[in-house]
Amino acid sequence: MKKIILLGGGLQGLSVAESLKSVGYYVTVMTELGTVLKSHFVDKAYKRPITDYEFFLEILRTDVQDLAIPMGDGAAEFLSKNKDLIREKYGTICAVPDYDSMKLVLDKDVFMSFCMQNDIPCPKTISLSVLNIGEAVKRVGFPSLIKPNVSAGSRGITKVCNVEDLNLSIGKILSTYGACTLQEYIDNQEYYYNVMLYRNKNGEIVANTVIKIVRMHPVSAGSSSCCISVVNDELVQICADCLEKLKWVGFADFDVLQRKDNLEYKIIEINPRVPASLRASTISGINFPELIVNDVFNIPQKKYVYTPGKILRYLGIDILWFLQSPKRFTAKPSWFSFFGRNVFYQDIYINDPSTWITWWFVGLKKLFVR
């Protein structure tokens, strides 16, 4: 039985652990998040911050692992930079792309520049500082978004409608998050897409999932609180072309907006690791964690049958969406549809009692760290 260690936790860790456990793998996790540490899907847990890489390497030395999978951007970067050394010294394979590809997507400014240079559809974007406000406004216009180059969960993203707004906001964003960009505002607060793909070393897209995020928190632009798996071949092709130009090998998770005026798609970012909404793939028939293991160890891939139309709710923040959205009683799917054969939860697993209460605390934490 292969031993697989997850570097990090969160809801993505919970989903990955469930998927791996369902096909018989031994799952180890290093995280300080209790929601995963107490999960019935985890065989062995080390309670440690995800950034304690020295302790992680000590785990590999004393408790040999066959494969390491990152649950966060920082963990993905660390494993990508050190994958050759880790394999040589500890015998552990790191399920991450090579760093030459990885470094192009970790920084949002670098990735947007790459997209614009390679005719990949994306919003107009320019690096922003207190010294080039005039040039940035001329290039991008208003309304626009100030976006930190490195952040997660929509943190720090601020909409500005004029120069006064920009001047009032930029100082705080720079001091809190560091370097940032000014990006064209895509006017669509109703939904966005999340596209998950796996590209193997032969350049083949082995599997994909597209989810449409129809409720989010914060309400206008945030993490998914309700999404639906869909079929969208055009989106898959756009994202696959992007991965080809990046020479990407491995799993990738795209955020994509669609303009309301001309219906054009615009790639916003790539997350170089599995997302918190990964369970949307699992309930739709695609086991990405199993697929990753199979590809890494040259195990013949299974034929997955994708079944769209599955609804995944993140109840902890869907409650916050309900409290703040004016569409609480008109939303589709209905906010009050708690049960059904196609309704699942990102934070509650029927087969893991440890999640039956912890979902509430995770949702509250999301509220207070915004």
Can you say where each PLM-predicted feature lies in the sequence?
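Soluble, non-transmembrane catalytic domains of enzymes that act on hydrophobic metabolites at membranes
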Residues: 260-262, 268-317, 321
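ATP-dependent carboxylate/phosphate-activation module, predominantly the ATP-grasp catalytic core
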Residues: 164, 172-173, 184-247, 271-296
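ATP-binding N-terminal substructure of ATP-dependent carboxylate-amine bond-forming enzymes
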Residues: 1-97, 359, 368-369
